[in-house]
């Protein structure tokens, strides 16, 4: 699909737009991640080694459509953030400039925040992001940045509670643990629950800025 512009257009027109229009007022749909870990599509022969240009075209068109039809946020869960969403002079494959160029200058072709992933095997790239700022981690800092995927059991030598609090203190805008239902050895809600409850207790106004414990129905 990504290698065919017509098929990208068909996906956006026939799926992305109807989906967004249908659910744009649902308070539970706050963001759409347009692709999980596209790094592997680019690097791994088994995943096609698809050029970034083709992936960028898809993201640009889909993001522009989502922003045209809704206020839903858009991101891409890049696995190796310091490698592919790096601050200058590094390479940011999903920068505003790149995406606009793939969408004929459409300013709506953009991400709303970055969401790099982190697992301990990635420590050799630029160490553990929880214990440094996004800038120190080497990321482009022109948007908010969320750690979009991390083991629910926490990073090496740290508890999830330590990871969450340190991410906040270092200026990260959120953390999303993998996974809720324990499909692998990375953990489940049982592991990350104490961390999220501790964070809520320490920063309740931040977690519930409107004083509501659940989105209005």
PLM-predicted stretches and their roles:
Residues 1-111, 121-125, 140-143, 154-178, ...:
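Active-site mouth of glycoside hydrolases
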Residues 124-136:
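Alpha-helical scaffold elements lining the catalytic groove of polysaccharide deacetylases
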Residues 116-118, 143-217:
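Substrate-binding cleft of secreted/luminal carbohydrate-active enzymes
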């Amino acid at each position: 699909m990504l290698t065919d512009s017509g098929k990208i257009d068909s996906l956006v027109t026939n799926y992305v737009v109807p989906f967004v229009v249908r659910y744009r007022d649902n308070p539970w749909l706050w963001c759409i991640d347009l692709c999980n870990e596209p790094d592997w599509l680019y690097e791994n022969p088994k995943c096609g080694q698809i050029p970034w240009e083709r992936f960028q075209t898809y993201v640009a068109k889909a993001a522009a459509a989502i922003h045209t039809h809704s206020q839903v946020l858009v991101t891409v869960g890049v696995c190796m953030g310091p490698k592919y969403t790096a601050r200058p002079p590094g390479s940011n494959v999903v920068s505003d400039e790149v995406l606009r160029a793939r969408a004929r200058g459409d300013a709506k072709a953009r991400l709303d925040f970055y969401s790099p992933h982190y697992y301990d095997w990635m420590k050799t790239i630029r160490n553990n992001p929880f214990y440094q700022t996004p800038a120190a981690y080497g990321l482009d800092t022109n948007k908010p940045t969320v750690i979009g995927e991390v083991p629910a059991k926490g990073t090496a030598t740290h508890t999830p509670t330590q990871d969450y609090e340190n991410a906040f203190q270092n200026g990260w805008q959120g953390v999303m643990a993998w996974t809720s239902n324990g499909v692998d050895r990375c953990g489940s809600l049982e592991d990350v629950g104490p961390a999220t409850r501790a964070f809520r207790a320490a920063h309740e106004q931040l977690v519930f800025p409107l004083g509501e414990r659940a989105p209005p129905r």
